[in-house]
């Protein structure tokens, strides 16, 4: 199937083989079959979500998707409410109460994407070669679709109820740092038994993520002295030359074995080629695998001093997203998921990755957290973003059984 002929038409799913499965317990096999029979419906849900563009910086667009999702989750018996924001879309919380007591499971994700409004015109949602392509298909509208269908499956198996309390939180600012949603995420996590994050899996084998690096952002500004580069060269103090020396010093702080990396990603400075630059600025990305390394690298950066004493340095920033470390609670949750996957017929692998998510916040609180439970595919944030359709049923089955058992 080359391309959907009409954007709003129902997607016809290419015939692809389901993932090969081993002999599995009867109940797990029946549940997997439930989602295999609904593969087209899951794919159609992803298409609907992808075709409502939701860039982080466009509040009306994000709120349109939030309103649709509130209706979908309420149709499954949830109580939806919005945490209102001015600068970003409203954050959606959905609570599913049951007659059974106990702490809820928190299903965590985001509805914002990195693509600007209008991207669909040149990057339309389509199904081809067993994959669904489109902006946000993998990161993470497939994860949201899996939430919806896993909850639907649980209600089907439990007489239109859920086997335990569940809270869904879909934030609208994850792709831009989660500044407004972090307090909400942490508050809900503290009252939860576990947090299941529906960010994309790692690699085409669908590994879940049991560790993520923490993220920091710093800005280094150098103030020198401007002068004419021909007439008064000796009177000037080049901010760019000083910044270059600082960048060289910063590069020596990298320690790959400890999972500590620093990347100067942006540099600016100067006004004209015949003017010795009075100012120069560098923006720095810092990644730490262990929270205990964060204070040390922060101190080292703030301890930087000018090589040229006639220049001044100004250093701002800090670690804004703690690492998700593979704690005992995280490891236990992975083992539980791995056992479920085994019963469903495949081996679930785990991975440690350099990127951060909102799961970093919840794991840092000591709440058992498992990330990467969303779709399987490639190309997140890129023009070739896609999700693999044949993997959707078993991801939904894994999520449903994990919600039930944690």
Regions found by a protein language model. Name each.
Residues 2, 6-7, 17, 21-135, ...:
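Acidic/His- and Gly-rich active-site-bordering loop/insert found
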Residues 2-6, 15-30, 37, 54-55, ...:
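Metal-dependent amide/peptide-bond hydrolase catalytic core
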Residues 108-109, 169-171, 196-199, 221-223, ...:
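Short beta-strand segments
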Residues 140-211:
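Acidic/histidine-rich catalytic neighborhood of metal-dependent amide-processing enzymes
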